[in-house]
Every structure is written in C-alpha cells, then in structure tokens.
C-alpha cells in the first residue's frame, strides 16, 4: 500500500519544494540591473539553497507516514497527559454542575477532597488513549491527504483544498476514535465516579465484568460526534490560517523564514484553530462525559436531559484547554518533522496551468 501511495505522492501538488524559481519575465532585467555600487547584480542562487535542504525520506513514502504517526503519538500523548488536571475538573463540571460550579471552584473542591494527587487521576488511560489517537489522526491524515489530492488532480486540489483538508481529517479521525474509545471510557469512570477505581488496572477489569466490551465502545458514536467535527476544524482551520498568516501577516515568504520563525507561525495558527475546535465539539464532549459515567444510558437520553444550556457547561475551561492543547500539538508535530528532516511543503500556490486558464499569466 505504502509503495503505491509513495508513487502517487511524487506527483502530488502538496509535494512542492520549499524554494521555487518562477520565471516572471523580469528575471533577466533584475539580474542585469546595476547594484548600489554600479556593479551588475548577481542573480540569487535559490536553486543552490534548495539543494542544501536534505530530507531523510521522500514525501508520501512509508517512512514519511510512519514518522508522521510518531509525531502524532508524541504531540497528542504528551499534551493531553499534561492537561489531565484541567480535563478532570472540566469533566466533573459536566457530570455534576451542582457540586463543581466553575473552573476555580472545581479545582478547590477537588484539592480539598482528593489532594494534589487527585488532580492526576486518569493519567494512564489518557496517555495511552491519546497516543494511539495521535498515531492514527496525524498519520492517516497525511495518507488521506495524498490519496484524495491525487484523486482530484493538481488544479482541483488547489481549488477545493479546504474540502480536501476536511475530508482527509474526517477520514483519519474515524479510525483514531476507534483506538481512543476504550481508554476514554476508562478515564471518565476514574475521574468522575468517586470510589469506582483509582487506576486503569483497577478500572478496566471492573468495566468488562459489569458490561463486557460494550463498556469500552458504547461511547464511540458520541466520540465521533465530538472528535470528527473537532478534527475537521483543527486541520482545515490550521491549514488555511497558516496560509493566511504567510500571505497577510508575516512580512516575508515562508522560504525566507528560519525554522524557529516557521514554528512560531505554526503555534499561532494552532491556537486560533483550537478556539474554534473547542466551540464546535463541546456539546458532544458533554454528552460523552455523562454517558461514560452512567451505566445503561444512551446518547439521546443524555442529550435530552442536559438540554441546550447543559451541553455548554464547562466551555470556558475547554477553550483554554483545547486552545493551548491544539497550539502545542501542532508545534510539537511540526518540530518532530523538523527534527527528522521530513518534507514540509509550503502553503499551496495556484498551479501555472490554472493561472493560464484564468488569464493570470502573460
């Protein structure tokens, strides 16, 4: 499979060099015009700069997808685990709003009842579950991005790139949630049911004994409701925000930015995307939290009981969490790509063939 995907990726419109030499009819004029000292200007050797960028693998190769998956493991596993205390308080606000009246009150009550160690409840299923989710989310996103773009062709890929980002991310998240569901169910039980279990080792056998495999996968449909819109927004908003930042905000082209400068743009775009992600996915997140706490309940019953106001409980805490989380995930993921010297194509540009059709070239 990877060999066929790699073959397609070589002709992929996303697989463009970081530095391109585009003949605009002014190159000869610029190269021969005198400089400040009266000497002829030497043409900038951008091709030589591009050659110096040595990649560890080809774009769309099996190694590329595997290392992207590794980047997903590192970015999702570490960030979600680091934010376990905030996630714990957010979940408790959703399932027991009478007791946990707000984010600060939630922390105060939790510290009073469980101590500092209580804030780390559920760290093991969080780390395992979101590491597996990150592997599938980022790894499969790159796979589907290549496959769908080659199905569309170069011109349609550019014209419909937002739809492509949405489709590729939704496809990837479908599989990622199947990997996440068992650990998410265990995490919510540990965090929201006092006395049920303190560790994953205690919770998993108890859940299986009570409800069988259903205990681990009954929340997968609400997870899809929460995570697929979230991930679609996360990837599409990030990709288009990066494109807009380089076009309207960053004062120089991406090819002239240093790696640290590029990573700053990545972080900013990630945070902007994260705010929208939190808003889009929060109602389903509330349903998942309550559903995994209660035995024998269903998503429709929970949604009916919570009502419109109830599903938005804990939104402020989630905006802080998801905004920070998404920014850090994109920053770490892009840093992993830099570390392993993976191809990182710049924001897409209109193909020359499309420019000619639209009469944008002379």
Curated annotation (Swiss-Prot):
Entry-annotated residues carrying Phosphotyrosine: 196
Domain of life of the organism encoding this protein: Eukaryota
UniProt entry tagged with the keyword Lipid metabolism: no
Solcar repeats: 63-147, 160-244, 261-339
Reaction(s) catalysed by this chain's protein: phosphate(in) + H(+)(in) = phosphate(out) + H(+)(out)
Short name of any one Pfam family annotated for the protein: Mito_carr
Record PTM N6-methyllysine, positions in chain: 112
A GO CC term assigned to this protein in UniProt: plasma membrane
Main location: mitochondrion
Transmembrane segments: 64-86, 122-141, 162-183, 219-238, 262-284, 315-333
Molecular functions per Gene Ontology: phosphate transmembrane transporter activity; phosphate:proton symporter activity; protein-containing complex binding
Positions of post-translational N6-acetyllysine modification: 99, 209
Stretches assigned to the Mitochondrial intermembrane side: 50-63, 142-161, 239-261, 334-362
Transit peptide segment: 1-49
Biological-process GO terms, alphabetical: mitochondrial phosphate ion transmembrane transport; phosphate ion transmembrane transport
Keywords: Acetylation, Disease variant, Membrane, Methylation, Mitochondrion, Mitochondrion inner membrane, Phosphoprotein, Primary mitochondrial disease, Repeat, Symport, Transit peptide, Transmembrane, Transmembrane helix, Transport
Membrane topology summary: Multi-pass membrane protein
Mitochondrial matrix topological intervals: 87-121, 184-218, 285-314
Compartments reported by the entry: Mitochondrion inner membrane
Family, similarity comment: Belongs to the mitochondrial carrier (TC 2.A.29) family.
UniProt disease link: Mitochondrial phosphate carrier deficiency: An autosomal recessive disorder of oxidative phosphorylation. Patients have lactic acidosis, hypertrophic cardiomyopathy and muscular hypotonia and die within the first year of life.
Oligomer status and interactors: Interacts with PPIF; the interaction is impaired by CsA.
Protein name from the UniProt record: Solute carrier family 25 member 3
Organism: Homo sapiens (Human)
């Amino acid at each position: 499979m990877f060999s066929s995907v790699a073959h397609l990726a070589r002709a992929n419109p996303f697989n463009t060099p970081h530095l391109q030499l585009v003949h605009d009819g002014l190159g000869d004029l610029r190269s021969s015009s005198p400089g400040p000292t009266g000497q002829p200007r030497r043409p900038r050797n951008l091709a030589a700069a591009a050659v110096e960028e040595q990649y560890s693998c080809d774009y769309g190769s099996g190694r590329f997808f595997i290392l992207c998956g590794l980047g997903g493991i590192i970015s999702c596993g570490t960030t979600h685990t680091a934010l376990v205390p905030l996630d714990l308080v957010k979940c408790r606000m959703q399932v027991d709003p009478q007791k946990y009246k707000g984010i600060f009150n939630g922390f105060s009550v939790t510290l009073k009842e469980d101590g500092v160690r209580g804030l780390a409840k559920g760290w093991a299923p969080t780390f395992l579950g979101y590491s597996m989710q990150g592997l599938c989310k980022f790894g499969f996103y790159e796979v589907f991005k290549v496959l769908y773009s080659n199905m569309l062709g170069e011109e349609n890929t550019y014209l419909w790139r937002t739809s492509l980002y949405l489709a590729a991310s939704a496809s990837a998240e479908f599989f990622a949630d199947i990997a996440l569901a068992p650990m998410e169910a265990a995490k919510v039980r540990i965090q929201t049911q006092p006395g049920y279990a303190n560790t994953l080792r205690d919770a998993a056998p108890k859940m299986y004994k009570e409800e069988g495999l259903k205990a681990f996968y009954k929340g997968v449909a609400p997870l899809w409701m929460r995570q697929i819109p979230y991930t679609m927004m996360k990837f599409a908003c990030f990709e288009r925000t990066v494109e807009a930042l380089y076009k309207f905000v960053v004062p120089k082209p991406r090819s002239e930015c240093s790696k640290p400068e590029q990573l700053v743009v990545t972080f900013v775009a990630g945070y902007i995307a994260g705010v929208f992600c939190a808003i889009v996915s929060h109602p389903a997140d509330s349903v998942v939290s309550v559903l995994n706490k209660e035995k024998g309940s269903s998503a429709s019953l929970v949604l009916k009981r919570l009502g419109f106001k109830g599903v938005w409980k804990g939104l402020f805490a989630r905006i802080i969490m998801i905004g920070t989380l998404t920014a850090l995930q994109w920053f770490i993921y892009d840093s992993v790509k830099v570390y392993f010297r993976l191809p990182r194509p710049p924001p897409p540009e209109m193909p020359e063939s499309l420019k000619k059709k639209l009469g944008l070239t002379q």
